[in-house]
């Protein structure tokens, strides 16, 4: 699958996770509704599904990974920033096939697209500290 299709999968995952975080509906229902209502022609749907189920299943674990690096309480995070960070931390901790830099750069781009004005700086700051601990780079 092309990198652009994976990028679109991440974009869709941010939107679906945002909905899930606010609604607290079952993630399978959120996925079904999202796929029924959105144009997913250029999306790696399999990867979208993996991100959704992986983040939902591991959300407490992912939140625990980010907490030490947050400058505020987890509850004070915007829902977009939380979704973006959860996706990046999922990729860093559970998806060795996603290169380190790709996970971080994609998260920054997602925050620029969907987040508040400077949320990409916040996301970058958290991941800059968390990523080397979660997935140490080989020297």
From Swiss-Prot:
Presence of the UniProt keyword 4Fe-4S in the record: no
GO molecular function, one term: RNA binding
Coiled coil: none
Pfam families, sorted: NusB
Domain of life: Bacteria
Keywords: RNA-binding, Transcription, Transcription antitermination, Transcription regulation
Similarity comment: Belongs to the NusB family.
Protein name, as recorded: Transcription antitermination protein NusB
Organism: Klebsiella pneumoniae (strain 342)
């Amino acid at each position: 699958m092309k990198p652009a299709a994976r990028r679109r999968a991440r974009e869709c995952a941010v939107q679906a996770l945002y909905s899930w975080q606010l609604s607290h509906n079952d993630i399978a229902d959120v996925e079904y509704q999202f796929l029924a209502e959105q144009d997913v022609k250029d999306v790696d749907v399999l990867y979208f599904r993996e991100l959704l189920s992986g983040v939902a299943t591991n959300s407490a674990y992912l939140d625990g990974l980010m907490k030490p690096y947050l400058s505020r309480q987890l509850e004070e995070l915007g829902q977009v920033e939380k979704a973006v960070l959860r996706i990046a931390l999922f990729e860093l901790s559970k998806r060795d096939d996603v290169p380190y830099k790709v996970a971080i750069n994609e998260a920054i781009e997602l925050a620029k697209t969907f987040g508040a004005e400077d949320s990409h700086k916040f996301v970058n700051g958290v991941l800059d500290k968390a990523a080397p601990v979660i997935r140490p780079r080989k020297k």
